[in-house]
UniProtKB/Swiss-Prot annotation:
Pathway: Carbohydrate biosynthesis; gluconeogenesis; Carbohydrate degradation; glycolysis; D-glyceraldehyde 3-phosphate from glycerone phosphate: step 1/1. GO terms for molecular function: triose-phosphate isomerase activity. Its main location: cytoplasm. It is found in: Cytoplasm. It comes from Roseiflexus castenholzii (strain DSM 13941 / HLO8). This is Triosephosphate isomerase. Transmembrane segments: none annotated. One of its GO terms (cellular component) is cytosol. It catalyses: D-glyceraldehyde 3-phosphate = dihydroxyacetone phosphate. Its EC number is 5.3.1.1. InterPro entries: Aldolase_TIM, TIM_sf, TrioseP_Isoase_bac/euk, Triosephosphate_isomerase, Triosephosphate_isomerase_AS. It is an enzyme of class 5 (isomerase). The gene is tpiA. Coiled coil: none annotated.
Length: 254
């Protein structure tokens, strides 16, 4: 049984004061999350502030990126050791914006996954196709290649500690969302590949999140799919009321 994970990626939004206000709003309305995990990933500058607020609460702390070395002359980089020191439990790796804007490739992303694991951080590996790739019928090929490139050479135990986030690039910040059926089909494919690499028993335990214009009005239908185990939420995580509605999604039996 996989525990749903609802993760908020704040991207390059929120000053420390704004971060405090948002977290206080989340904590005020969170209530009993039951069988769900809640995660927020603020910008680096707000990590300490958010850590101090969420410590001892159901909200976990994550970062949006990490470098591959524990320390050294890497100006502007943040190491996994530093993230652990700040209380982070998770880190996003390979987000489509890191791939497209900052030129990160599969080799570097794979190294970041390994660096996170080596320092007891849970990496959230992001994979997904662009609109031209999807229109050309290559979506599955692209996503499978990204998963394999990042995880090749890892042991089943290592792969079992990773979270995958499927984020169709064409849906991020556009208001467009993959239909629940389309998202489920890709999640099922990802789980099959994870099974090929780590065994079906391990694959069955791995959380595969959906990311791409997740909103309060589509979360219930997405979470009704058998292989969608949570969401990586962008814009809708920047307001307490919308993220809380996502956290408290209605499961099919409700």
């Amino acid at each position: 049984m996989r525990t749903p994970l609802l993760a908020g990626n704040w991207k390059m939004y929120k000053t420390t004061g704004e971060a405090r206000e948002l977290v206080e709003g989340l904590l005020h309305g969170l209530g009993d999350v039951g069988d769900r995990k809640v995660l927020v990933c603020p910008p680096f500058t707000a990590l300490q502030t958010v850590h101090d607020l969420v410590q001892g609460t159901p909200i976990a702390l994550g970062a949006q990126d990490v470098y591959i070395e524990p320390q050294g002359a890497f100006t502007g980089a943040i190491s996994p050791v530093m993230l652990r020191d700040l209380g982070c439990a998770y880190v996003i790796v390979g987000h489509s914006e890191r791939r497209a804007i900052f030129g990160e490739g599969d080799e570097l992303i794979g190294k970041k996954v390994r660096a996170a694991l080596a320092h007891d951080l849970t990496p959230i590996l992001c994979v997904g196709e662009t609109k031209p790739q999807r229109d050309a019928g290559h979506a599955e090929t692209v996503v499978v290649a990204q998963v394999r490139a990042a995880l090749t050479g890892m042991t089943p135990e290592q792969i079992g500690r990773i979270v995958i986030a499927y984020e169709p690039v064409w849906a991020i910040g556009t208001g467009d969302t993959a239909t629940p059926a389309d998202a489920q089909a890709m999640h099922e494919t990802i789980r099959r590949i994870l099974g090929d690499m780590a065994g079906s028993d391990t694959a069955a335990t791995i959380n595969i999140l959906y990311g791409g214009s997740v909103k309060p009005d589509n979360i219930d239908d997405l979470m009704a799919q058998p292989d969608i185990d949570g969401a990586l939420v962008g814009g809708a995580s920047l307001k307490a009321d919308s993220f809380l509605r996502i956290v408290h999604f209605l499961s099919p039996q409700e």
